[in-house]
């Protein structure tokens, strides 16, 4: 395939659509990006226009080819990674959506999830789908559309409607309505999919009253699904050959494809995934059991956990406390002091997630003495991100019995060397920061490239997945455990704060 020089990853996110062009050495050659409209019809409701998602995504595909000055016959394949759970229902004959896309953040189906709990379905859903009962996932969103859009249920019963997450919608549009598929990673986020049998679950379809005919075919994350002439000139057709939900794509982009390998994405919050191989582990700590890819893009399993407030705590220092001017300053101020002087910041602004699951916890600063200053508070705030990561990873290790080999990292806060070094120290494992920061797009590109022979196997990619810097842990175990014990004490005192206040 010497004439094929490039792979394109379509990265369809919550606020923008991007196209990333990569060469055979997995270097980013060019990026095109377009934002699209966020629609908030009521408090707690979030929608996107599916046609605008498609318009922005298809235009970035054409734009990235034009900007790079390449021809479409040089493109080996297109891979797709996407915002997960976001739900689209459209007419099979026309391709017209019957309603806006209901976004993963949307809370409109809380009454449906409350009824699922009241009717005693929680344990079945947990054991079958790996998920907690929450409006976050696609199943209740599909039900809402069928129940609330005039004529939708009747059309669905007649087999005239199709459902898909964003990946399914993009493949449908790219192939001009010829292919209706999803991959295992996205299917596992719908609350309609049995992650053990790897089939759509009849009982869940019955509980939510969703006809089977609406569902896409579920395929591996690395295979050729169809061809597209979008982005192709002169009749050239490009294979669409890789799909993974954004967090699973990032896991694959880090080449975490074996049990015990983990990645953490540091954004507003943190998304952590620990690969568990062929074991679907039901968490005792409120983590999600989800599907991830093995080396060949076939379905295996992972545990997923999230920290609500990570990078957002640095924004708080900047915007509310005004003790840093921008996020980049935090590293400088944190290193103006040699330690946190006993100060702990618990950034529980919206409660605490795994493993505490306390919506009544609130933010607090502990351990203040007369000598504490703003630099200590900045340092303690950065440290809180690392402590929370340890909390989740300890839950993961407890559930899985796997000892973390190393932690691969991505996201904005990974540029903070102080935070990354402290993360290594508090976890007692190496923290590896990659050269290529577009890890989610890399994952989609790898899956597409392997499916089409652009890359031979994962061993070839390992040479390209270069680590920019490894942060090795401090060997002082006594200091590490003393610090972490202080953090646990601080968290304990912030729990149920708002609940006690109400009483």
Curated annotation (Swiss-Prot):
- Could you tell me which InterPro entries the record lists for this protein? ATPase_NBD, Carb_kinase_FGGY, Carb_kinase_FGGY_CS, FGGY_C, FGGY_N, Glycerol_kin
EC annotation from Swiss-Prot or TrEMBL: 2.7.1.30
User: How is this chain's activity regulated?
Assistant: Inhibited by fructose 1,6-bisphosphate (FBP).
Positions with a binding annotation for ADP? 14, 18, 268, 311, 412, 416
Pfam families per the record?
FGGY_C, FGGY_N
Presence of the UniProt keyword Transmembrane in the record: no
**Pathway(s) per entry:** Polyol metabolism; glycerol degradation via glycerol kinase pathway; sn-glycerol 3-phosphate from glycerol: step 1/1
Catalysis performed (reactions): glycerol + ATP = sn-glycerol 3-phosphate + ADP + H(+)
Record-annotated residues binding glycerol? 84-85, 136, 246-247
Residues reported to bind ATP: 14-16, 268, 311, 315, 412
Q: Please provide, alphabetically and separated by semicolons, the GO molecular function terms listed in this UniProt record.
A: ATP binding; glycerol kinase activity
> Might you report a single GO cellular component term?
cytosol
Query: HAMAP family given for it?
Result: Glycerol_kin
Q: What does this protein do?
A: Key enzyme in the regulation of glycerol uptake and metabolism. Catalyzes the phosphorylation of glycerol to yield sn-glycerol 3-phosphate.
Instruction: Please report which protein family the annotation says this sequence is part of.
Output: Belongs to the FGGY kinase family.
Q: What is this protein called?
A: Glycerol kinase
Organism field: Haemophilus influenzae (strain PittEE)
Q: What is the primary gene name for this protein?
A: glpK
